[in-house]
Amino acid sequence: MSGSTGGRSFADIITSIRYWVIHSITIPSLFIAGWLFVSTGLAYDVFGSPRPNEYFTESRQGIPLITGRFDSLEQLDEFSRSF
């Protein structure tokens, strides 16, 4: 028989008022923080991904697709020069 760790059971935790007071504040706060992180564009800046209007520029309208197996480094250099 296993010993008790002295912790509260899961049923006791989720039926307590304290649990719901804490989580009724933190869960919506995390959702709002994530929504603001994405909607303000900060996610694009932090992760370095291009914004939706920056995928295709005036000078580069084609898809940067690597087609050759052995000359892939040259193709990558060509794509990076077009930025």
UniProtKB/Swiss-Prot annotation:
Q: Which residues bind heme?
A: 23
Any transmembrane segments, and where?
A: 21-35
Q: Name one GO cellular component term.
A: chloroplast thylakoid membrane
Which processes are annotated in GO (biological process)?
Answer: photosynthetic electron transport chain
Q: How does it sit in the membrane?
A: Single-pass membrane protein
Query: Gene encoding this chain?
Result: psbE
Gene3D superfamilies referenced in this protein's UniProt entry, alphabetically: Photosystem II cytochrome b559, alpha subunit (1.20.5.860)
Its predominant location is: plastid
Keyword line: Chloroplast, Electron transport, Heme, Iron, Membrane, Metal-binding, Photosynthesis, Photosystem II, Plastid, Thylakoid, Transmembrane, Transmembrane helix, Transport
Query: Record's PROSITE patterns?
Result: CYTOCHROME_B559
What is the name of this protein? Cytochrome b559 subunit alpha
Q: Which domain of life is it from?
A: Eukaryota
Q: What does this protein do?
A: This b-type cytochrome is tightly associated with the reaction center of photosystem II (PSII). PSII is a light-driven water:plastoquinone oxidoreductase that uses light energy to abstract electrons from H(2)O, generating O(2) and a proton gradient subsequently used for ATP formation. It consists of a core antenna complex that captures photons, and an electron transfer chain that converts photonic excitation into a charge separation.
* Pfam families per the UniProt record, alphabetical: Cytochrom_B559 (PF00283), Cytochrom_B559a (PF00284)
Q: How does it assemble?
A: Heterodimer of an alpha subunit and a beta subunit. PSII is composed of 1 copy each of membrane proteins PsbA, PsbB, PsbC, PsbD, PsbE, PsbF, PsbH, PsbI, PsbJ, PsbK, PsbL, PsbM, PsbT, PsbX, PsbY, PsbZ, Psb30/Ycf12, at least 3 peripheral proteins of the oxygen-evolving complex and a large number of cofactors. It forms dimeric complexes.
Q: Which family does it belong to?
A: Belongs to the PsbE/PsbF family.
GO molecular function per UniProt: electron transfer activity; heme binding; iron ion binding
Instruction: List localization entries.
Output: Plastid, Chloroplast thylakoid membrane
For activity, the cofactor(s) needed are: heme b
Cofactor comment: With its partner (PsbF) binds heme. PSII binds additional chlorophylls, carotenoids and specific lipids.
